[in-house]
Amino acid sequence: MHDAVTRPTPPSDATSWPRRQTHAVQIGGVTVGGGKPVVVQSMTNTDTSDVASSVKQVAELWRAGSEMVRLTVNTVEAAAAIPRIVDKLAMMGIDVPLIGDFHYNGHQLLTAEPACAEALAKYRINPGNVGFGKKKDLQFAQLIEFAIRYNKPVRIGANWGSLDQALAAKLMDENNHREQPWDAGRVLREALIRSALDSAEQAVEIGLPRDRIVLSAKVSGVQELIAVYRDLAQRSDFALHLGLTEAGIGSKGIVASSAALSVLLQEGIGDTIRISLTPEPGQSRTQEVIVAQELLQTTGQRAFTPLVTACPGCGRTTSEFFQELAKVVQSHVREKMPMWKIQHPGAENMTLAVMGCIVNGPGESRHANIGISLPGTGETPAAPVFVDGEKKVTLRGENIAQDFVALIDDYVERTYVRNAG
């Protein structure tokens, strides 16, 4: 049994961590691990058997930038719906890998609906509830055999909310015989890690190649998640899926996920992520995708859309116009990005600044590709615009927002070469 976790050594320049080397796993048209960029995934909350609602939500998540989407497969009706969902998405021109989330009865569902097994791009199996007692190994093997038959990858996802109780009891008993027993939390973390690793090795013994296995071991505490994944990363070369199992609602969920995942990502740990936010009433499910993208972008992992820097405001910025302009600019670049991604590759790396007064406005604007310094209280009613560090023009009047957005569009057209294809 592994007794200690060695914290990774930071790089000498303290700016970037080498990515952990893992097997590359092909999931539909997406590659996870093997040094590829960290992949964003999400999960629906529709009744999967409701094909129309599920297709609509998958499409929304995909348009927001989700590169894989997981759906609950908990009934025969849900399993039967999966091929129809895939077909309807294909008719819409959406080719996003769908992941089937199985608990308790996955072996029965795939036996009853083999078309589901073929249509899914990946299966998620929870080793804590795939079966109990003598049935566990048999039912786990049945699921792995479906993956082998249809050439599908599997995520073996352990979760401390549904931990393998037999394994936990065994490790607790072993711990009682230690000269220096671990605390209960450490034993449970070890049980979670062992559950994932032992199940992965069992899958390999059955015949599933290592490059078709992704692991996860989720908890809901920030420090626990960091400890679990550092250990899991040291003890295997499987691709890893990161995420808190229940991050929470609103800002708490965003902060908790960011606090945990940013540490691991900066250490080169993690090949795919999901931000498990509880949506607020009326809030779009796509929020979890946007947060995942922003987390990867702010930690320097990937670029999805131009970053907009804006000052927080103070007594010098009594006008709300700079706040309104920052919102307009952010919405504009998000709206334009799908087209820019095709026609102007590289535009996602552009940086923008919307500043509210003379204190930091000109300096911050010079650091951006395009920046505007709006007048603060008592300042001259003029807004200088800087392009690549040089003052280009001063905007005045009622149309500053429209004029600044037009300058952004012009910059993209001139700077990022149009892809004629």
UniProtKB/Swiss-Prot annotation:
Cofactor(s) for this UniProt protein: [4Fe-4S] cluster
The name this protein goes by in its record: 4-hydroxy-3-methylbut-2-en-1-yl diphosphate synthase (flavodoxin)
Function: Converts 2C-methyl-D-erythritol 2,4-cyclodiphosphate (ME-2,4cPP) into 1-hydroxy-2-methyl-2-(E)-butenyl 4-diphosphate.
4Fe-4S as UniProt keyword: yes
Domain of life: Bacteria
Cofactor mode of binding and number, as noted: Binds 1 [4Fe-4S] cluster.
Annotated segments matching region Disordered: 1-20
Family the UniProt entry places it in: Belongs to the IspG family.
Keywords per UniProt: 4Fe-4S, Iron, Iron-sulfur, Isoprene biosynthesis, Metal-binding, Oxidoreductase
E.C. number: 1.17.7.3
Binding positions for [4Fe-4S] cluster per the UniProt entry: C311, C314, C357, E364
GO function terms (MF aspect): 4 iron, 4 sulfur cluster binding; 4-hydroxy-3-methylbut-2-en-1-yl diphosphate synthase activity (ferredoxin); 4-hydroxy-3-methylbut-2-enyl-diphosphate synthase activity (flavodoxin); iron ion binding
Record Pfam families: GcpE
Catalytic activity: (2E)-4-hydroxy-3-methylbut-2-enyl diphosphate + oxidized [flavodoxin] + H2O + 2 H(+) = 2-C-methyl-D-erythritol 2,4-cyclic diphosphate + reduced [flavodoxin]
Gene3D superfamilies: Dihydropteroate synthase-like (3.20.20.20), Sulfite Reductase Hemoprotein, domain 1 (3.30.413.10)
Record has Metal-binding as a keyword: yes
A GO BP annotation: isopentenyl diphosphate biosynthetic process, methylerythritol 4-phosphate pathway
Classification via NCBIfam families: ispG_gcpE, PRK00366.1
Enzyme class: oxidoreductase
